[in-house]
């Protein structure tokens, strides 16, 4: 019976800055299956200096999105129905580790662990107001991918961020990781990662200021990304 041994199930409230770290992990780690990436599953926002502050790639699951329409009511779905939705965006399901990401997983963490006991579960945490403010900073209601229609308005967005964060705090032992190697190892992945030129081949839009970084600068950048927020990891 399938138990999710090749899954990394990820959640975080809107504005928790999860997308950039997830995207970076998928680029540096050779084991990650990125066959859910298409030119349509993209959102990017840059600040006035050209720095990327919104970096959404690959499938997101949840109501009003292309996959996981009923994931706000995931407790009403069977394991088979959930797994069917997980598989849909991947051109090649049978290879590597699949990252499955949804804000709505925060409402169903114990159920997901029960359904997929061998999956690695990963969460991101930032305080409610900081999440709300950052989400607006990267586009707010103008973000077109993923879709946030379910949250309706600012009042409900703030309310649901609070609920999601509370659920995450109750389920995970949150900590600020010392750097990328600690986090990647705890996620069950190899620290033998891609070089910057290899990443640029996969994603030419990868922030070009790092193209000529020396190894120590590259590692410092990765450390900063993986240690900037509290995260929780539950391995199988």
Report each predicted region and the residues it spans:
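PAPS-dependent sulfotransferase catalytic core
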Residues: 1-85, 194-220, 236
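Short, well-structured alpha-helical segments in soluble
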Residues: 84-92
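PAPS-dependent sulfotransferases, especially Golgi type II membrane carbohydrate sulfotransferases
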Residues: 1-6, 156-236
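PAPS-dependent sulfotransferase catalytic domain
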Residues: 93-192
């Amino acid at each position: 019976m399938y138990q999710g041994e090749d899954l990394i199930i990820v959640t975080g409230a809107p504005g928790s800055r999860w997308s950039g770290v997830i995207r970076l992990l998928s680029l540096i780690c050779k084991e990650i299956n990125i066959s859910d990436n298409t030119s349509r599953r993209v959102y990017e926002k840059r600040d006035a200096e050209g720095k990327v502050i919104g970096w959404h790639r690959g499938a997101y699951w949840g109501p009003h999105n292309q996959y996981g329409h009923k994931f706000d009511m995931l407790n009403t779905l069977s394991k088979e129905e959930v797994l069917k939705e997980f598989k849909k965006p991947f051109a090649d399901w049978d290879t590597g580790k699949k990252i499955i990401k949804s804000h709505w997983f925060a409402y169903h963490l114990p159920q997901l662990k029960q359904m997929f006991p061998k999956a690695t579960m990963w969460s991101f945490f930032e305080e409610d107001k900081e999440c709300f403010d950052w989400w607006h900073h990267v586009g707010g209601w103008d973000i077109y991918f993923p879709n946030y229609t379910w949250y309706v308005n600012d009042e409900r967005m703030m309310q649901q961020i609070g609920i999601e964060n509370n659920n995450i705090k109750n389920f995970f032992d949150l900590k600020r990781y010392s750097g990328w190697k600690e986090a990647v190892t705890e996620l069950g992945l190899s620290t033998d990662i891609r070089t910057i030129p290899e990443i640029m081949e996969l994603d030419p839009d990868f922030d070009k200021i790092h193209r000529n970084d020396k190894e120590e600068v590259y590692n410092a950048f990765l450390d900063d990304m993986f240690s900037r927020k509290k995260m929780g990891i539950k391995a199988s």
